[in-house]
Amino acid sequence: MPIDFRMTKKGLILLIESYSSIESLKQEIMAKFNEARDFFSEGDEISLMLTQETSKPDDIVNIVSLLGNLGVRVKDILVGSLEKKNVKIGQKYDLVREKVTEVRGAQVIKRNLRSGQIVVHNYDIIVFGNVHPGAEIIAGGSIVIFGTARGILRAGYSVGDEAVIAALDLKPSLIQISGLISQDYNVYETPAVAHIRTGRIVVEKIESAKFEVKGGKI
């Protein structure tokens, strides 16, 4: 089945093998949870398992947000496959969560993010700490890191080109804003910001950044 629940020694897994569109997937997930509504309680934890084909960062934001609205907490994101009746896990990312603030629904993380940890949120993400290599952040809005930024940073899945990625020390292995990706960018020893200008990602010192807005630059 394209979408199914699997009970393992480590708990319940929602397995997503395939889907035609994110909207159809959301409908299927809601139908699955409706069928099993007597099984779940508010705040229950599950693992979300995707295949290499379905582990799309922009869709992960929507899936995690939907599951939260359905009352369950995603404790980790797995990437693997279903072989016969056995679940084979290739990669595992622990989902880091903190209380959402009142500021536009931003999620504030007050810790360092280590390798194998992932933060997924539909709005802005603010990190008071370092993002180490092997960690990943996926944001619907912007990402601001009060620390050193390594790992993979993906922003703008909800707000698009208006998103920015800023850090006191911005040196990630990959930057993605909306549909644009960059691994080759200017590196500074002072606070820097990545943003989209004239259709490409640019990284500049925060103090001298020239942001593109409708009608020109500021």
Swiss-Prot record:
Q: Does the keyword Cell division apply?
A: yes
* One Pfam family cited in the UniProt record for this chain: MinC_C
Note the superkingdom of the native organism. Answer: Bacteria
Q: Can you supply a Gene Ontology BP term from the record?
A: regulation of cell septum assembly
UniProt keyword annotation of Magnesium present: no
Keywords, sorted A to Z: Cell cycle, Cell division, Septation
**Where exactly are the transmembrane stretches of this chain?**
none
**InterPro entries listed in its UniProt record:** CAP/MinC_C, MinC, MinC_C_sf, Septum_form_inhib_MinC_C
Q: Which family does it belong to?
A: Belongs to the MinC family.
* Quaternary structure annotation from Swiss-Prot or TrEMBL: Interacts with MinD and FtsZ.
Q: Which HAMAP family match?
A: MinC
- UniProt function note: Cell division inhibitor that blocks the formation of polar Z ring septums. Rapidly oscillates between the poles of the cell to destabilize FtsZ filaments that have formed before they mature into polar Z rings. Prevents FtsZ polymerization.
**NCBIfam families given in the database record:** minC, PRK13992.1
Q: What is this protein called?
A: Probable septum site-determining protein MinC
Gene name, per UniProt, is: minC
